């Protein structure tokens, strides 16, 4: 399988996604085409795994996210603790525990 391919996961059909703090079904989780992140590529993201209830290397991922945001003068808009609370809220709302891939995206406004 190539790097741009993925195996379909039936859990994705009912997944809730946080967009600006609102938990939305996948079909409603959208970003405006006028968003700076979409128009200008103004944003940062990190991808991480949930394995046996643990977020693997989460501190490293959050550090890298904040460094990347700083490098492009992007204010994440939330503290590390607030971001972690939102990640945990998404995990809880989706009853996630293992073999989960999460992506955190922060876009410019």
Description of each model-found segment:
Residues 1-109:
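Conserved alpha/beta cores of soluble small-molecule-handling proteins
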């Amino acid at each position: 399988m190539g790097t741009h391919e993925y195996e379909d996961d039936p859990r994705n059909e009912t997944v809730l996604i946080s967009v600006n703090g609102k938990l939305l079904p996948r079909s409603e989780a959208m970003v405006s085409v006028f968003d700076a992140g979409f128009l200008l590529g103004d944003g940062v993201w990190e991808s991480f795994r949930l394995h046996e209830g643990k977020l693997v290397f989460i501190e490293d991922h959050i550090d890298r996210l904040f460094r990347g945001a700083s490098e492009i003068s992007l204010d994440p808009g939330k503290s590390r603790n607030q971001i972690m609370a939102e990640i945990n809220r998404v995990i809880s709302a989706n009853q996630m525990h293992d073999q989960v891939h999460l992506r955190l995206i922060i876009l410019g406004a």
